[in-house]
Amino acid sequence: MSSRRSVKRSLVLDDDDDEDIFYNFKVLLPNGTSVKLTLKNPEPEISMQSFVNLVKKEYDNARKDCLLMSKRMKVDWNSGGKFHLESNGGKMKGIVRFAAFKPDLCHIIRLDDGSGIASTMYENLWDLTPDTDLLKELPENYSFETALADLIDNSLQAVWPYREGARKLISVDISGDHITVFDTGRGMDSSEGNSIDKWGKIGASLHRSQKTGAIGGNPPYLKPYFGMFGYGGPYASMFLGRCDFSFCLPILICIVLLRLTLFSVRRTLVSSKTKESKKVFTLQFKKEALIDNRSIVGKNWKTDGGMRDPSEEEMKLSPHGSFTKVEIFESEFDISKIYQLQCRLKDIYFPYIQFCLATIFLCDELSKTGRTERPVAFQVNGEDLAEIAGGEVAITNLHSKGQFFSFQIRFTLFGGKRKGTAQEANARLKFVYFPIVQGKESIEKILQSLEEEGCKVSESFQTFGRVSLRRLGRLLPEVRWDSIPFMQRGNRASTLQKSCRRVKCFVDLDAGFSPTPSKTDLASQNPFSVALRNFGSKSTEKEKDDDVNIVIHREGKSVSYAHLEEKYQEWVLEMHNTHDEEAASGLDEAVLIVGSLDKKALGILRDAVRVHKEVRRKEKTWKRGQNIKILRGAYAGIHNNNVYATIDYFLIEGFEDEAGGDTRILCRPIDRPENEGCKLSIIDGISKLEVQSSLSLPITIIDSGKCLPVDANEWNRKLDKQQEKAPSKIDLLDERDCRELKIDGELPIGNSVRAGKAPPKQIVAVVRPACFTSLTPSKKLDQKNIVKMDGEEMVMVVKLKSSDKNISSQRLFPTSRKGISGLYIFSLGSKFPNLFKKAGTYNFSFSIGNSIKCNKTVVVRPSSKAARWELDDNLESLPCNVRVGSSLPPFRIACFDKYKNKIPFTSVPSLEVELEASPGFLIKIDKLETNLINDGLILKIENMLVETDELDQIRPNYEATLEIRAMDNPFSVSVPCKVNPGPLKRVAVNNPKALENLLPDSTVEDFILELFDGYNNHVAEGTDVLIHIDGYRIEDWMGINRKVDSRGCINLSGILKVTEGYGKSVSLSVMSGNEVIFCKESQIDERQLRLVTELPDCCTAGTNLMNLIFQVTELDGSLDTSIHHDEKSGCFHTMSIESDSSSVESAIRYAFVHGSCKVSSLSLPENEGVFSCRVFHSRYPELQMSIKIQVTSAPTSEREESGYSTPHSKTTPPPESGIPSITNPWPTPCSQFGVLAIRSSSLALSSETSLMDMAQYTEDLKEKINIDEERRVELEERLKCLQAQREHAEQECSRLQASLEPLGAPFPECLSTKESMMKQIEEKHHDTAASVFCCLYRKAPPPRSLFLSQKGMFGVVALLGSVASTSLSRVLSEYLGKDTMLSLVCKSSQFGPKSDEYRKFQSEAASLGRSITNRFLVICLDATRPWRNGLVRNDPQKRLAMDNPYLPNGDPIPGFKGYAVNMIDLASEELDIQSSSGYGLRETLFYGVFRELQVYETAEHLEAALPHINGGDAVSLDGVIARENGFIYSGCCTPEVHFPITVTERQEKALVQLEITRDKKRKTEEMMTEENRSLRRLVKKLKKANEKYQNFTAMADS
């Protein structure tokens, strides 16, 4: 024994070494009771009997304290060795070994007495006494579904942590009186950490500790850690079993649990098993047991429990060996509603039952594969909830459309209950669109479907909850928020606002949000709940909340609230435009209106609408003209009272095939007249809709029942009542009423007042009702007689009847004064103190809208006292222009008072009229007529003749002042005038001898024409004067069309050049209109060409006449030394000899030197006979003479010297022979100028008998070579000079072209004037009829209009008109072609080949030395088909009224510049040309050649416009020509003949200067060509002469 004890003692530590050891047991007794046994420091082993004795002792003590235990069956404690212990499936007999139990833990063991009777339920096994603080927050408003969901929450949280592959099952079985909730979670046992009593003990659940693990993560936050308070299980079972908790607890518990007294549970049994446990532990709520606990005096709340083996069915449902089963007995449930319960449970746990990618607004984040997944298997009465098709969530899914809109919000709370820590919560908001389809709202369809399934929701479209909350994936069923502020967008009844009502928000929350104890709603006072509920309010936008911080994320990025709001609105409108389908179908044909819509007034967003008069909605037909009643609250602005109105039209947005269009009702309120209603008009096929005073209401007011039809009786009653109170007229308060209101406000209506009377400071207008008939002054200010007119604006317009402008225009809203409302107080005298100073009738117009109007007049008469005279306003613009010799225009003088009001003259006053200017200029006008008109208001003065010869005193502006004075009072009128000289009547010459003793090519010096009018005044500066000259040329750009200078003269000094020859007559005349008023004829001095050398009577054939001297003399025989050839100074005087003999060549020129010309040698012919030749001046052929001489045959002779050879077969005589030599012994003056062309043949021997010394010949040849070398150097220098002149001309051309850049930039070669183009036609098209016409036209004397009428033709097409740019000139000229451009234009069609006009034209061409060899086109205006559709009004160019082309949508065609026929500019004389029928050039000629030719900016514009050009040609400014036949001509070329360019006067001067410079350049280039040719010939000649010289030198040396 001692050894055994020592062994046993070794298990017990000394008190000094360690603490005490306690073993706690709950012993289940055979009689169904249990006792608690605690052992301190027991032996490691004790006998079974000793252990039973300890149990018996505790049992006896318990019986004494509890009467219920004393009534139980007694335990046979004397069973001896039959007792054994059973713990978790293991048995212990004989000896109890404590090593099998862990100290400090409570172990449940069952004591078996060996009788074979074993109980499975034991009294008071579990202690469920709660913490009283937890009982303060028990749930309220429980329902059957929410209570059942509380039990399922526990099951879901139990099964969720299981690994993949383990069965996750929650099975609910419900019958009429029994409910079973079974799950395959980890289960419970009797262990301290997982004891089954925690399920039933309020606040003991371990699920609450897992809450923090469900904060954060990814939406939809599927972590079912729902535990919050720890009483979901017991409280739900109490509710479902209708338990009566009227048992005894401590006083605080009793007070708190009074709300639970309605529950009366019969029995609830909880059975649970863990995977490690072999036994199933049970816990039971039973009414009898709870009542029996009252004997415990409320210290403990205990309930029965037990331990048993698992059933076969339980192990089948949970193959892995763990489960929990809650059974509620004697429950009350209507089994016929089992389907609705299944649908409800599916709604609550939808994400945990199933999810797929298609369920876009729930759990799409969890679906990685796109297929439907089943996280947990839910069964209700054996039916899988995933296979149940009903439920609000499933039905909602079916009716949503389009993409969702989502974002996440992170809420952070600093402070709160836990100071110094930050709390966090997360929410994901998904917005789904439920469109209106075929006129029915999808939300209404959802409600209808729920009603059909028996799951009716007591909501309508208006009250439908548009926010659904899930916390950790579990629906909070009582959250049926109408919306959150973020979802409320747009003005009331706007498209955006209506579309937002079709959005539902699905909110997923994490565990950071706290629910109510019943988990049916969010805790209302929680800061996160408040922040979510108010998201989108102004406080959210401005972030004024100092506690909760909000961070928004969308698509993984942080976004601002403003950006989020913008994107949300865009999404809503996109969904509306894409998916909404209004079903308000019009029963009549729609009128389509595109654009020109007041979208704000109509409440629409689109640019196109369809207007109907009749639609069908809600199985009813609604028509235009139908009377309706709109109930208050139906629409913005309809708040306080119902509105009666008449339907005008129905408006549907968009085209027929477009979705998203809203339907609206346009109706006119009953208080608005018919003419202020909506107006639909169609003008020229264009529809227009004017809203005016009608209301635009959404069609949905019919759907909501807020719009009702009104029968005739109700309408008439309302109309009568409305008309009685309706505003009827506007009235002005009189002096008495204004005085009572303390307002200076009487308007002098009906009586006339004198100008200058002060107007009242204010006037008061009121609106009287229709029932107002009292004239009693005391009642005019009664409020019942004054309509308040709240919000109605009155307009007062003050206008003087004689003026088109408003004097004053004021707009006011009504105010109140002394308790009287509806007063419109307008400021008058305080704002316009000078109002009544102008005489006339003042019209005061008062109006409210277009229905209530009032007009009052005030007559103001002018003052009776005259103050001044003034010219009447009807005069034309000043200063007044008058010519000497004519009368001034009539003057109208009015008399005015001091307020500038016109008053009548009492009589015709005596007048003094003078024209005054600078000192010394005064013209009295005595000839005039005066009379009074317009009832004496106007003094008319007329026929004032102006005559004077003193205008030169006030030139050049001719400004003067006309003074009209009254002789009997101090009134006068001054009129600025401009007295211009009369027309040209006389011409004087400053130097009459300037046109005497004229010589050819001389320039007239000191020759000035003075031009006078008929009163001997110099004519005005700038006057156009036509000078006709014959034999002269004016050498400047102005030519014969001259302008008078500032002195009244035309200076021709130095520019008038003689062009005729010696002895010819010349003339100069000045034209005034068609009259010649000055003519000066002169004769050029005569000269004679004489031969000074005496000729022999006869000469031998083949010899030379030597040293012939010719002179130019005057008639008296004196030598004219001015005839001198000087090429450098431009004086060319040479002589030519012409003969029929081939031996004399006319190409030789002989130079005159101071009047004499010497011919050193003139070869005679080889044949005998009479030799004759004509000698003449090369430039003046009238200086000529003829030479005749007899030529005889030469006798035969021998050589006088033999052995002397000559370079030729012929010899020349030696110098001493006395025979004339052909050589010139001295250099002729001609050689100095390079004019005399000495040919090589001139060195030949003139006779076979002539002999020449070889040395002399060689010397002469050398001298000739030197002369030619000098000439070559001179030619090269001259070429350099010409080159410089050409370069200067090119630079000048470039400068002038730059100044004309806008005109000639594209094609400067087309930059020309009419004169230059005429000259070009004349020169380059020599054999054409157009060239002949231009030549005749240029030579015709003025006026040329007379020439045109005589010829019966108007000109050439190319010269009739001009264009604005060179690019337009080029393309139009190329379009017409050269033949058309050179066509002659005549009036009559009689200009045929056999007509007199044609033959006359041909004869005139022959007289010019021209022949018309080419065919030419004649266009007859009378024969063309003119344009007959009218001209553009008030257009000085008389353009054709042609409609511009348009695109099919009505827009103008891009790049269109105009019609070619209208782009031709016509001069004034061309505008006067008409056919016999009165049609002008544009209507006949140009319309005939161009028709409807269209001009475009570029080829791209032309190509784009081709499909829209019907039956016509088109061109572009860059050169493309498109013909009607489909041919398109591209490329670029410059036509030979083109239209001149339209230029200003300044541009014309530059253009003329450009033409002169071009001509100089052209002449310089021609001279350079000629000089180069001469240089080449001279170089060739020098080469041959040098070769000869070398040969002769060699012969002489030999």
UniProtKB/Swiss-Prot annotation:
<dbReference type="GO" id="GO:0005634">
    <property type="term" value="C:nucleus"/>
</dbReference>
<feature type="coiled-coil region">
    <location>
        <begin position="1258"/>
        <end position="1301"/>
    </location>
</feature>
<protein>
    <recommendedName>
        <fullName>Structural maintenance of chromosomes flexible hinge domain-containing protein GMI1</fullName>
    </recommendedName>
</protein>
<comment type="function">
    <text>Contributes to DNA double-strand break (DSB) repair via somatic homologous recombination. Functions downstream of ATM.</text>
</comment>
<feature type="region of interest" description="Disordered">
    <location>
        <begin position="1191"/>
        <end position="1218"/>
    </location>
</feature>
<keyword id="KW-0227">DNA damage</keyword>
<keyword id="KW-0539">Nucleus</keyword>
<keyword id="KW-0234">DNA repair</keyword>
<dbReference type="InterPro" id="IPR036890">
    <property type="entry name" value="HATPase_C_sf"/>
</dbReference>
<keyword id="KW-0175">Coiled coil</keyword>
<dbReference type="GO" id="GO:0000724">
    <property type="term" value="P:double-strand break repair via homologous recombination"/>
</dbReference>
<feature type="coiled-coil region">
    <location>
        <begin position="1565"/>
        <end position="1595"/>
    </location>
</feature>
